[in-house]
Amino acid sequence: MLSSALLCCLVFLGGTGASRGQDTPAENSCIHFPGGLPHMLRELRAAFGRVKTFFQSKDQLNSMLLTESLLEDLKGYLGCQALSEMIQFYLKDVMPQAENHSPAIREHVNSLGENLKTLRLRLRQCHRFLPCENKSKAVEQVKSAFSKLQEEGVYKAMSEFDIFINYIETYMTMKIKS
């Protein structure tokens, strides 16, 4: 009985000693995340490039959906929440509708969505990049304007996706520096 208790203690202590000084895979990926961000943004831009002309040619509106107020929220104390909500907005509201506009672009919009999901997953794994709870007024304005535009909203939101990528880059650059 004493020997099995001693064996359990040794196994436990050996396991904790071996893991001390070794990062978990999630922690390890967070160390390399800033270096991999430019590649992820290039992939997003390349995926968007395959549908950009389609959506921008269909966008006949002169107004902007993604305004400076959204960029200011991303730069401010609500940056984390604004980014999280905007990723969710594109994944849940915009892209499912965008996929249905032409069979020729469905695969490309799907690929763009997968790249955005990968970015969101990495951001969530590295909590310092996405540690948020509050709501962003700018995102609420984007969602409200999108809803009012009805079908035109999809063209508008997708045609401005490159602006969103630039906003992501601005937010992440700030976070990496801090």
From Swiss-Prot:
Q: Name one GO biological process term.
A: negative regulation of B cell proliferation
Q: What is this protein called?
A: Interleukin-10
Complex formation: Homodimer. Interacts with IL10RA and IL10RB.
Positions glycosylated per UniProt: 134
Chief location category:
secreted
Q: Where in the cell?
A: Secreted
Record keywords, A-Z: Cytokine, Disulfide bond, Glycoprotein, Secreted, Signal
What organism does the record attribute this protein to?
Answer: Oryctolagus cuniculus
Q: Which cysteines are joined by disulfide bonds?
A: 30-126, 80-132
An annotated GO cellular component: extracellular space
GO terms of molecular function: cytokine activity
Signal peptide (residue range): 1-18
Lineage at the top is:
Eukaryota, Metazoa, Chordata, Craniata, Vertebrata
UniProt xrefs under Gene3D superfamilies: 1.20.1250.10
Q: What superkingdom heads the lineage? A: Eukaryota
Q: What is the role of the protein in this entry?
A: Major immune regulatory cytokine that acts on many cells of the immune system where it has profound anti-inflammatory functions, limiting excessive tissue disruption caused by inflammation. Mechanistically, IL10 binds to its heterotetrameric receptor comprising IL10RA and IL10RB leading to JAK1 and STAT2-mediated phosphorylation of STAT3. In turn, STAT3 translocates to the nucleus where it drives expression of anti-inflammatory mediators.
